[in-house]
Swiss-Prot record:
Family per record: Belongs to the enoyl-CoA hydratase/isomerase family.
Name this polypeptide is given: Uncharacterized protein B0272.4
Motif (Microbody targeting signal): 253-255
Keyword Nucleus included in the entry's annotation: no
One cellular component term from this protein's GO annotations in UniProt: peroxisome
Keyword Isomerase listed: yes
Pfam families, alphabetized: ECH_1 (PF00378)
Stored InterPro entries: ClpP/crotonase-like_dom_sf, ECH/Chromodomain_protein, Enoyl-CoA_hydra/iso, Enoyl-CoA_hydra_C
Gene Ontology molecular functions: isomerase activity
Keywords carried by this UniProt record: Isomerase, Peroxisome
Disulfide-linked positions: none
Length: 255
């Protein structure tokens, strides 16, 4: 069972996983990460599921990243057991294709997680931003490993060091996005692509992923995920980070 903020629907041999927190732009909470862990673990063991489609619910945002409200920040003290790190570990080891259907703006962890997914189909109005330097945090979800290899060092640095926002077209040129679809026909065109993929050999897709993401690469990614989390946890005690997060996410009290 999930909290209702994560929706799942099986369409033939495809599992659709949808973020369902539109009032908060689908920002991810600790509980949502834990729910995603359950959903993906179950999908990994289900022989009737060929691959997973990961997308956002209604609204202009695919996902606004992690929820950095004070209540959520307080859950980040235990790195090893936090749902966020556990979910990234699951994505790294997930044996079947994961297709990100980016149907709106993507921010923070929703961008960095794309590096451990297998295809990224984006609406042409989407933007991609990782404003780490704006709030005093660091790369996450193995992005310090994956994005320089996907985009090249300078493009990855523009995104993660200098808080540059990428359009869907720019992200496509950089290699982060696999395909761009026009907003006017996005849902119809995306469905056609997913329907075509659903008719492909699930065994071929699974074996191809296993051969591409070797045990050595998985181990490297797991190590990077742990290293990033250690750095991230340490940054939460820095005065600069505290000041930036407070200014961005904490509403001043009304006296």
């Amino acid at each position: 069972m999930t909290s209702g903020l994560i929706l799942t629907e099986r369409k033939n041999n495809v599992l659709w996983v949808t973020l369902n927190r539109p009032k908060k732009f689908n920002a991810l909470t600790r509980q949502m990460f834990l729910d995603l862990c359950t959903v993906f673990n179950d999908a990994a063991d289900d022989d009737d599921i060929a691959f997973v489609v990961f997308t956002g619910g209604k609204g202009k945002y695919y996902c606004a990243g992690s929820d950095f409200s004070p209540a959520e920040l307080s859950t980040l003290t235990d790195i090893q057991e936090h749902g966020y790190k556990l979910f990234v570990d699951i994505l790294i080891a997930f044996p079947k294709p994961i297709i990100a259907l980016v149907n709106g703006h993507a921010v923070g962890v929703s961008v960095t997680m794309l590096g451990v997914m297998d295809a990224v189909i984006a609406i042409d109005t989407a933007t991609f931003a990782t404003p780490f330097a704006d709030i005093g945090v660091c790369p996450e979800a193995c992005s310090s490993y994956t994005l320089p290899r996907i985009m090249g060092h300078q493009k990855a640095a523009a995104l993660m060091m200098f808080s540059e926002k990428f359009t869907a077209h720019e992200a496509h040129i950089a290699g982060l996005v696999t395909q761009i679809l026009p907003a006017a026909t996005f849902e119809k065109d995306a469905k056609k692509i997913i329907d075509r993929y659903s008719k492909l050999s699930p065994i071929t897709m699974k074996v191809a992923k296993e051969l591409m993401r070797t045990t050595q690469i998985k181990d490297e990614l797991l190590t990077v995920n742990r290293k990033e989390q250690v750095h991230l946890n340490g940054m939460f005690s820095h005065e600069d980070t505290i000041a930036r997060l407070t200014a961005k996410f904490v509403k001043p009290s009304k006296i």
